From Swiss-Prot:
Highest taxon of source: Bacteria
HAMAP family hit by this protein: Ribosomal_uL18_B (MF_01337_B)
Quaternary structure (record): Part of the 50S ribosomal subunit; part of the 5S rRNA/L5/L18/L25 subcomplex. Contacts the 5S and 23S rRNAs.
Protein name: Large ribosomal subunit protein uL18
Family (UniProt): Belongs to the universal ribosomal protein uL18 family.
Record key words, sorted: Ribonucleoprotein, Ribosomal protein, RNA-binding, rRNA-binding
Disulfide bonds: none
Stated role: This is one of the proteins that bind and probably mediate the attachment of the 5S RNA into the large ribosomal subunit, where it forms part of the central protuberance.
Gene Ontology CC: one annotated term: cytosolic large ribosomal subunit
Gene3D superfamilies per UniProt: 3.30.420.100
One Gene Ontology biological process: translation
GO molecular function annotation: 5S rRNA binding; structural constituent of ribosome
InterPro entries, alphabetized: Ribosomal_uL18_bac-type, Ribosomal_uL18_bac/euk
Length: 121
């Protein structure tokens, strides 16, 4: 039997394969207990077009500097910031790659904030 982490990584790999056949940029999310990271990667999977995370100094300052990057409010801020950066480089449409994480909580908050800020997926 696969462990919980191995199952998540297998789901993530299968999702990346499906997204690669579409040829659109993908918004990928990684979360840890302390931080959340998001990137927009080109359709061919070679180049990172935009990225944002709660580990960035100016994001931490905007969140109050308390190091609370592992909550829903922080995820919403990252989603909005990432959408703005992606639109600045000309990316409007992406495929959402949640990397095997459940679409719930911080992952959902990030996705909803990115949609509200103008990304389509």
């Amino acid at each position: 039997m696969l462990t919980k982490k191995e199952q998540r990584l297998r789901r993530a790999r299968q999702t990346r394969i499906r997204i690669a056949t579409q040829g659109v940029a993908r918004l990928t999310v990684n979360r840890t207990n302390l931080h959340i990271y998001a990137s927009v990667i080109s359709g061919d999977g070679v180049k990172v077009l935009a990225s944002a995370s709660t580990a960035e100094a100016e994001v931490r300052k905007a969140l109050g500097g308390s190091g609370k990057g592992g909550n829903v409010a922080a995820a919403q801020a990252i989603g909005k910031r990432l959408a703005e950066k992606a639109k600045a480089v000309g990316v409007e449409k992406v495929a959402f790659d949640r990397a095997g994480f459940a679409y719930h909580g911080r992952v959902k908050a990030l996705a909803d904030a990115a949609r509200e800020a103008g990304l389509q997926f």
